[in-house]
Amino acid sequence: MKHSRLFLFLTFISLVGLSTFLNAQFTGKQSDWKGFKKTVFKVGEYEAFVVQPKEPAKDKPWVWRARFPSYHTEIDEMLLKDGYHVAHVNAGRRLGSPNALKIWKQFYNLLTNKHGFNKKVVLEGVSRGGLYVFRWAKAYPETVACMYNDTPVCDFKSWPGGKGVGRGAQGEWKRVMEEYGFKNEGEAMAYRDNPIDNLEPIVDARIPIMHIITEDDAIVPPKENTYILKERLEKLGHPFFYVISIKNGKPSTNGHHFNVESPQIGYHFIRKYSDFSNEYPIYLRSGLKNSRHVFSKTKKGRVGFLGGSITESAGWRLHVAESLQKRFPQTEFDFVYAGIGSTD
């Protein structure tokens, strides 16, 4: 009997200790970040931070900002309100190299093992951050819930190399040579493990990806980056690649920066693919901006009319269909009339 009590007591202490361990508090310099607590600390010699939600969601979902974590934070703020953590480690000017991967692995292990963060993370890659997130996703696809990338670099020959139509950045191109250990430019040009290469691990893991780009981006031209990636993923049969295209970015940044008008698009994408509960996601309607984007960009649209006798009658649905055709004259619509009358 005494042995049983001792066993139960030790088990209780063990469980309490494990719970405390997995919910260890972050120590470091704390500050306010848009109403949330931000803690800055070191991972080895590298500075990192975590922004904590006021009430963590079940299963501790989190967003990992690769680079420029203070740029386009609208989606992060929305996710923090839903209980997500937001994290970043500054790996320096390593441009997504294998050396950067070692730093990232240390950071990931710290957050998941010591602080109980979810094993599957949402990756966010802004600009050169694309080099980091794809390096990680191909090396550790089982750890990625989804990827949301903002004007991402998908081939360092395009940026910083400037070997296509993009402007390039010679200082960063030299850094690529040093960081990746290339002896000459020929080796860099022959390198075949950019984000656009060796995509099978991402396809096999069926990792959902969304890119938001500007068509007039002269720094990271989409034709040399996102669209090559898109074509190769489609050839491999990857069904979860989405592109949000903006016609013009800011002239002051050669089209590379832009204002986020509809952060709900990226927010809903992330929520859909990183909701680890068994609850069916329900999103309140927040306008028709998504539909407008599809109608304007793809010139195609499918509109379904669902309802009872009012929907079945000719007046209302035909009026809406006519209005859409006038509003988007270049768009080819497929109207699905599925109203069912409630009376005979």
Question: Locations of the language-model features?
Answer:
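Glycine-rich nucleophile elbow surrounding the catalytic serine of serine-hydrolase chemistry
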Residues: 125-135
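Alpha/beta-hydrolase active-site loop
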Residues: 95-116, 135
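N-terminal secretory targeting modules
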Residues: 275-306, 310-333
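C-terminal catalytic histidine-bearing segment of alpha/beta-hydrolase fold enzymes
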Residues: 51, 224-278
